Amino acid sequence: APDYNGYYDLIPEGFDFCDRVGARLAMNIFWYQPGSRARNSKCPLYVSVCMRDTVAPAKKTLKYLSGTKNVEYKKYDCGHFDIYVGSDFEEAITDYQNFLYRTVPVK
């Protein structure tokens, strides 16, 4: 997926980073589909759908959400890791906070 190397932008400068994972991950990663369980959630969900995502494609994410109750989502014009940095992050974090303020009010 073209987005895969975007996670490098999340690593702090000067951080001693080991770019490896255990081989056992390869046997599970292709079947890991957290969105497939969204339908079973009993709590309110907020989902950020990155429309240019090549790691977790938006079309599949939207399909999972179509039958989910108590879900709110927003489409962002960015890739998978773009939403964690820069202006995409600023927009998304504001949306996350607003969702929390509405669904988990603090008195």
Model-predicted segments: where are they?
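Glycine-/small-residue-rich active-site loops that bind phosphorylated ligands and cofactors
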Residues: 53-54, 81
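Short, surface-exposed alpha-helical segments at coil->helix boundaries
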Residues: 58-62
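Catalytic histidine-centered segment of alpha/beta-hydrolase-like enzymes
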Residues: 78-93
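Alpha/beta-hydrolase
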Residues: 1-37, 43
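Short beta-strand/loop motif that positions the catalytic acidic residue
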Residues: 41, 47-49, 53
